[in-house]
A protein has these predicted regions:
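Conserved glycine-rich cofactor-binding loop
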Residues: 17-18
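Substrate-binding pocket helix/loop in short-chain dehydrogenase/reductase
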Residues: 100-102, 106-111, 198, 209
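Short, well-ordered secondary-structure patches that form non-catalytic structural/interaction elements
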Residues: 104-111, 115, 203, 267-268
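Active-site helix of classical SDR
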Residues: 125, 163, 171
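Alpha-helical segment proximal to the catalytic Tyr-Lys
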Residues: 130, 176-180, 237
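C-terminal helical subdomain
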Residues: 187, 203-239, 246-248, 271-276
Length: 276
């Protein structure tokens, strides 16, 4: 008996050319799944697929535009033609305009972010779900990528936040629609994760991002991948419609670096009492 949790299963990872997507695809392969990789960058996809193949896994790379229905339909059809089934999907593509106050955002840039996040996730599930319903074993698991920004909001990121809130809503409805048909749908909501964006921002930005979490550090793509893998495995068979933060406690609330003793603040200068 094989003890790999995804042995004999087929996983589809959208946005698999780099970062969290590539790391998650590699995690699926290491857990025994055949993996289908999707993204716009064909060369980067091929490199990830080659790495999986060299480590003894099975990978298929399919260049895909998640906002185009025909492209997403082709992705799922290629998956079924190659492997004959689809058991797990991670819809991870994301986009958004540069940070700016809401009134300063270009409408076309706003639309682009919404299309990638909401339309891309919708199209992914639209074609993934029928394929999963056809599995002899019945059903499958879908994980969609949101963000803590979709849970609590972030200033100057209106398009990104709106997109992530929309993904959470789509996930909730899909989970309800298919809960009694063997398909589970959940959301992961990462906080600050060390990917190429945060690496490019430099050490100071990384330090500040870490300090924004109660755990006082940033997360890794591997930590996100582990949660996605669990949500797609039999170990989470009673979990659907959930939003799982992966944020070091950031969405739970604020934790000041140093807490004052009760009443201490009132004893400080300027609060009605003076020191002798």
């Amino acid at each position: 008996m094989n003890d790999l949790p995804m042995h004999g299963r087929v996983a589809l990872v959208v946005g698999a050319s780099k970062g969290i997507g590539a790391t998650t695809a590699e995690a699926f392969a290491a857990a025994g799944a055949a993996v289908v990789l999707a993204a716009r960058n064909a060369a980067a996809l091929a490199a990830v697929a080659e790495g999986i193949d060299k480590r003894g896994g099975r990978a298929l790379a399919v260049r895909t535009d998640v906002t185009d229905a025909d492209s997403v339909r082709n992705l799922v059809e290629r998956t079924m033609a190659t492997f004959g089934r689809l058991d797990a999907a991670f819809n991870n593509a994301t986009d958004g305009p540069p940070p700016a106050p809401l009134a300063d955002i270009d409408p076309d840039e706003f639309d682009r972010g919404i299309h990638t996040n909401i339309r891309g996730t919708f199209l992914g599930m639209k074609f993934q779900i029928p394929a999963m319903l056809g599995n002899r074993s019945g059903g499958g698991a879908i994980v969609n990528m949101a963000s803590t920004a979709g849970v609590s909001g972030t200033a100057n990121l209106a398009a990104y936040v709106a997109g992530k809130v929309g993904i959470i809503g789509l996930t909730t409805v899909a989970a309800l629609d298919y809960a009694d048909r063997g398909i589970r749908v959940n959301v992961v909501a990462p906080g600050p994760i060390l990917t190429h964006h945060l690496r490019a921002a430099g050490p100071q930005a990384q330090r500040l991002a870490g300090l924004s979490t109660p755990m006082r550090r940033i997360g890794s793509a591997t930590e996100v991948a582990h949660v996605v893998l669990w949500l797609c495995s039999p170990q989470s068979s009673f979990v659907t419609g959930a939003v799982i933060p992966i944020d070091g406690g950031q969405s739970a609330g604020n934790k000041p670096p140093q807490m004052s003793r009760p009443g201490q603040a009132m004893a400080e200068p300027g609060h009605g009492r003076s020191r002798r």
